Amino acid sequence: MTTSSYFLLVALGLLLYVCRSSFGSEHTCESDASPHPQGVCGSPLAEAVEAACELEQSLQGGTGKKRGRASLLRKRRAFLSMLKARAKRNEASPLQRSGRGIVCECCKNHCNIEELTEYCPPVTEGSG
């Protein structure tokens, strides 16, 4: 093996290691995993996501009009109730679609505020 081929192989291995370690922090779950002692599950999880989304909205400036703000909150609440129903349906199903999701990240593992805000629905000011 020539020196340049060896260098390329080492560089590729290092790149794969860096990519794997940066994505390795993702939570994965088994279907029968028990909740984390500091995990948030059920209705408190939906409330935590709602609070995180409202906090993110207020930090980003929100909307200038009260009516628009109320409409955005209604849309977010509808989205969060749909998310909660979907989580219940997926937990009841023996064949889950994937090992990741809000229940996996925040109930069966412990999640932080950034992970909670990943589940906020995209809401634009003009969609009211």
UniProtKB/Swiss-Prot annotation:
Its main location: secreted. Gene3D superfamilies: Insulin-like (1.10.100.10). Disulfide bonds join 29-104, 41-107, 53-120, 106-111. Residues 1-24 form the signal peptide. PROSITE patterns: INSULIN. Residues 59-89 form a propeptide. Expressed by the venom gland. GO terms for biological process: glucose metabolic process. GO terms for molecular function: hormone activity; toxin activity. Belongs to the insulin family. This is Con-Ins F2c. The lineage of its organism: Eukaryota, Metazoa, Spiralia, Lophotrochozoa, Mollusca.
